[in-house]
A protein has these predicted regions:
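Carbohydrate-binding surfaces of carbohydrate-active enzymes
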Residues: 1-226
Length: 226
């Protein structure tokens, strides 16, 4: 699942009723909002282009989710990996749920920016930094486009300062063992895939080519098919 940076966009004066368009009058603040939105949509787009199934997860819904056996469960959906886009803050209740998820074996991959703003009475920045194995705030590095590999903190908490998609895919591969894998011989990213497990015995896979032309592709399934 990919966490929505809802409250981070709010604090940068993004209007949630109009696609988080900026409603303030500070150019620096406007640029920060633009950067947060671009990075969030960028992660989303790259996950789609690399055929990684995911759902968007609102922090308020996360607060109500059930966390057991290293999975976040919401209705019929469950997630073993939670990806955090760059965020400047997070609600305490959502952070408590993330901590529980990590304690139970879940995987959390944060990108570029960890929360540093306080939107509630409780200060949690240092606890978040400790969880991801960092000794200082990431706020200045993000706005300066810091580059680097990744840091593994407590349990399965990862922080990728550069937000490099290849590093994100590498960490995902370490923990997310795909039952169905699709790739083209040419490496073209014009294909979109959607996988839905309808029962323990049945999985539906939809593949669509968004461009013209023929391509050779391979689909691998990790279990016997009839």
């Amino acid at each position: 699942a990919l966490l929505d940076p809802t409250t981070s966009l709010w604090t940068q004066m993004g209007n949630p009723f109009h696609d988080f368009h900026y409603i303030g009058n500070d150019e620096a603040e406007k640029e920060k909002l633009k950067r947060l939105k671009q990075d969030w949509s960028g992660i989303s787009k790259q996950l789609i282009l690399h055929h990684k199934d995911y759902d968007h997860l609102d922090p308020e819904i996360l607060c109500e989710a059930e966390v057991t056996d290293g999975k976040i469960t919401i209705g019929n959906a469950s997630y073993s990996v939670l990806i955090l886009p760059p965020i400047t803050n997070i609600e305490t209740a959502a952070w408590e749920k993330i901590k529980l998820f990590l304690e139970q074996g879940g995987v959390v991959i944060a990108n570029k920016q960890l929360p540093y703003e306080s939107i509630e009475d409780e200060l949690i920045e240092q606890e978040i930094l400790d969880t991801f194995g960092l000794d200082q705030s990431t706020r200045s590095d993000y706005w300066k486009a810091f580059q680097g590999s990744y840091r593994k903190g407590q349990q399965n908490a990862y922080f990728i300062p550069s937000g490099d998609i290849e590093i994100l895919l590498h960490v995902l591969k370490m923990h997310d063992h795909e039952e169905i894998h699709f790739e083209t011989e040419s490496g073209k990213k014009s294909f979109l895939t959607e996988k839905r497990k309808v029962s323990e015995e049945s999985t539906l896979v939809f593949v669509s080519n968004q461009e013209e032309g023929k391509h050779h592709a391979t689909m691998r399934v990790s279990y016997p098919c009839e």
